[in-house]
Structure formats: C-alpha cells, structure tokens
Amino acid sequence: EDFMGKKAKIEYFKFQRDRAAQRAKAREEAAKAGAGEGAAGLKMELLEAQGGACLYTGEALAPTSLDDYVIDHIVPRAKGGPDSALNYVLTTRRANDDKADRTPHEWLSATNGWDAYVERVKKRTTALRNKKASLLVSPEAETLVQRYTAL
C-alpha cells in the first residue's frame, strides 16, 4: 500500500512534470543566450527569479553573461549550508568573493547597503519563495536552512 493517496500522487506527478518542463525551458533559454556550462539552466532559473539582478548588490545581470556569474550558497557550505536550490542565488564573482564564508546578514547587515538589499529581497519574495527570502535576510539563516531542508 502506498503512503500517498491517489489525489496526492496525481498532484505530485503534475508538480514533477511542471518542474521538468521549467528546467528544460531554462536550459533552452540559457543555450539561446550563449551559455555553455552545465549549470546554465539553473543559473537562468535563478536569474529569472531574481528579476535579472544580483540580490546582494543590485547590479543588473545579463542572460548573455551567465557563464561569468557564480551560484552562491546563501548559507555557505563551510557553515553547513546544503547544496539545495533553496540555498542558491546567482551573483557576480566579486560579490561572491566579498561575501566569502558568511551569510548575507553577517556580510551586509552592518553596511549602508543593508536596507536596499532587504528591499530587493522583499520585492522578489513571490518569485524567490518565502523560505528563500527568509534565509536571505535572517540573522538565524544557519538554523533556518537546516529546518527547511531537514528530511
């Protein structure tokens, strides 16, 4: 006997099909923009969710430059952050290097750019999803990411 009911199973399989279609579309768009690396589809999805901008700096990110950008872990791997889409943002190499092994809160909260950063995240909350938006601004991001990704 299955642990999922018939309706839940149908919804789950629909979700899987929809996500597969979204990933395929993102890979196709990335290829059209000239991106060649394996993570280009994921980068395109992140770029779209972020409204074509680096959340950390506000800098515009161009689809034609996907290969120049990096996928950053919101909660760094060094702090136990998982390899999970929930924990990824697209950013520039410079911003990634500046952030280093810190959460966005540790890195930006004491700077003049914090309020503008929080506003950028708030404006994109629907596209980013609430959990990711929370991770991006929380002083407790390390704890939150474990709760959000625990099985």
Where are these regions (language model features)?
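Domain-exit/linker segments immediately C-terminal to small folded modules
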Residues: 86-87, 91-151
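Histidine-centered nuclease catalytic patch
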Residues: 58-90, 99-107
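Alpha-helix initiation and N-capping motif
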Residues: 23, 54, 68, 111-114, ...
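Non-transmembrane, interaction-prone segments in cytosolic or luminal domains
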Residues: 11-17, 45-47, 60-63, 90, ...
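Short, charged surface segments at domain edges that flank catalytic/cofactor-binding sites
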Residues: 2-59, 81-84, 127-149
